[in-house]
């Protein structure tokens, strides 16, 4: 028996969000963080280092590309495609484009495609019969296409509003590639009921891409879940049986091919580690998925009568499966934040289906909390920036000097102009939201998304020099280079993948692993690995010159040694 839908939506509540405004808003969120910054520690710099290594190994054939290594060390994430894309982008980019920016271009595209695929996935889910609002006795209910478009707009705004999306979606790491291909699979399964070719191509791209980006097990689970959903739906849908069979066979074949690809390339790895710190994991869930998690819970509550018949309500079944898989992965794997990133499209989808059932008081609570939180964050960013430029107020300026010793602030007219424009746009948006306008179900997500975009833009403009100084390895490498000169040959011991990549990129150093032979005039050692140095090198050949500290990190020291024997070559 079909349960009555809790969505009661009139046609006037699904008015169109202007396309130009939506596109410009998405660009304002996507571009800051990709333009004008240094590669950051650790994952961002590490991934870029593997891309540089692949670019330098073009002459060694394709076999080197199947097992990327950085000075003989394999990547922590068994991914291939993200490193390939970055290396290809640097290879094809003209010489006047900086290598690190060229490597980011495919990731700009992947973040864009993530937003697009999520929008279309929700659009198709919202057109399914079980998602439709209550039909009014005398007409006037929302038309299916307009209703679906309004919910898709709401889901896109909800996804951008997620606090956990901002940083990880602007790094050149396998995590963003996994997010992109997850959204491809999501759209592919969601759209198969209405179309065949494009969703199947999207699902194929997503399954193969996720497998090659370090997530073959997740891809397999997504494929199995989509297949089960299609099989259950076939029992209730009699129209176009041949189309449904082709859809099921196609998805089954694609899932099997993705699993076979992972086996052929030896990408299957099991890193299941039960969580040791449940409170920390709980805090991660609370802030990382804000503000979609309370709305997702509201959806489950308001649609609770439909949860027992999920096969007839694909708009609930599909995001619930994707969210369950990714949240389970978050709990059972060490990279919890990067695993939880993959849950955001599904949680944003569930949040979107809360919008037609949201009470006026709850919508007002969301607006007021968002207004206060993001306005306070923006005000803090401006105050600290003013303190960096003028020394007033004194306390924020003193805090910056203490946390980032040696940082010299600079003024950029372009950055200031962008930040000022974003702040004025936020003020206008708040004024518009407080005004009397026709109701639209996506309006409750405007301030959360706008506030998240505002603060991210301010951080990536006003605070970018400070963040580059604090999160880049460049100051550390420059300190070492001032003592060794450049270019120089360095032997290394105990350095992390990110540190190795940074010394190669920022310092143009030739790096060699430390051994009993003094092959270079200089040796650098991570302070945490100093206790094992005697097992690797003959310290009689070296004289300690200095301890170099990364300015913004008291726990990251590099020991610099100089060769004293004349036996090296």
Question: At which residue positions do the language-model features occur?
Answer:
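Short acidic/glycine- and proline-prone juxtamembrane loop motifs at membrane-interface regions
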Residues: 164-177, 216-218
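Transmembrane and membrane-interface helices of multi-pass
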Residues: 148, 156-161
């Amino acid at each position: 028996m079909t349960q009555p839908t809790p969505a009661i939506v009139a046609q006037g509540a699904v008015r169109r969000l202007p396309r130009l405004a939506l596109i410009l808003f998405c660009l304002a969120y996507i571009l800051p963080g990709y333009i004008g910054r240094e590669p950051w520690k650790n994952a961002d710099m590490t991934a870029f280092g593997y891309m540089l290594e692949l670019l330098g190994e073009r002459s060694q054939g394709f076999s080197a590309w199947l097992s990327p290594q950085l000075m003989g060390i394999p990547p922590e994430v068994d991914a291939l495609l993200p490193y390939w894309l970055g290396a290809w982008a640097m290879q094809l980019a003209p010489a006047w484009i900086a290598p690190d920016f060229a490597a980011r271009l495919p990731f700009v595209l992947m973040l864009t495609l993530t937003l697009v695929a999520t929008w279309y996935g929700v659009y198709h889910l919202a057109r399914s019969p079980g998602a439709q609002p209550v039909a009014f006795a005398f007409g006037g209910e929302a038309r299916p296409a307009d209703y679906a478009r309004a919910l898709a707009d709401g889901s896109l705004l909800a996804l951008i509003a997620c606090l956990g999306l901002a940083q990880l979606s602007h790094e050149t790491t396998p995590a963003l590639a996994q997010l992109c291909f997850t959204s491809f699979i999501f759209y592919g399964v969601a759209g198969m009921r209405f179309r065949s070719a494009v969703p199947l191509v999207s699902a194929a791209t997503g399954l193969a891409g996720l497998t090659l980006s370090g997530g073959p097990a997740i891809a397999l689970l997504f494929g199995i879940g989509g297949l089960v959903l299609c099989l259950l739906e076939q029992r209730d849908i009699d129209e176009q049986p041949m189309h449904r069979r082709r859809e099921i066979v196609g998805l089954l074949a694609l899932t099997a091919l993705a699993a076979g690809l992972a086996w052929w390339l030896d990408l299957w790895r099991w890193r299941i580690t039960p969580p040791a710190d449940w409170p920390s994991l709980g805090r991660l869930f609370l802030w990382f998925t804000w503000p979609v998690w309370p709305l997702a819970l509201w959806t489950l509550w308001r649609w609770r009568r439909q949860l027992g018949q999920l096969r007839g309500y694909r708009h609930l079944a599909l995001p619930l499966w994707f969210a369950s898989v990714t949240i389970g992965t978050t709990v059972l794997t060490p990279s919890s934040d990067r695993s939880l990133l993959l849950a955001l499209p599904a949680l944003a989808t569930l949040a979107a289906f809360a919008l037609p059932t949201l009470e006026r008081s709850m919508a007002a609570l969301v607006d007021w909390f968002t207004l206060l939180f993001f306005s306070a964050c923006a005000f803090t960013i401006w105050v600290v920036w003013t303190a960096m430029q003028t020394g007033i107020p004194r306390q924020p300026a003193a805090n910056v000097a203490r946390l980032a010793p040696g940082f010299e602030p600079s003024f950029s007219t372009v950055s200031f102009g962008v930040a000022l424009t974003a702040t004025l746009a936020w003020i206008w948006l708040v004024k518009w939201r407080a005004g009397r306008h026709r109701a639209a179900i996506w309006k409750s997500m405007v301030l959360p998304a706008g506030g998240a975009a505002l603060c991210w833009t301010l951080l990536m403009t006003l605070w970018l020099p400070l963040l580059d100084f604090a999160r880049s390895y460049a100051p550390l490498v420059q300190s070492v280079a001032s003592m060794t000169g450049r270019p120089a040959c360095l032997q290394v011991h105990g350095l992390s993948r990110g540190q190795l990549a940074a010394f190669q990129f920022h310092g143009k150093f030739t790096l060699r692993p430390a051994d009993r032979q003094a092959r270079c005039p200089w040796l650098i050692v991570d302070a945490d690995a100093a206790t094992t140095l005697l097992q690797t090198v003959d310290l009689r050949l070296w004289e300690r010159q200095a301890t170099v500290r990364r300015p913004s990190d008291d726990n990251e020291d590099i020991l610099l040694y100089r060769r004293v024997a004349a036996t090296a070559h």
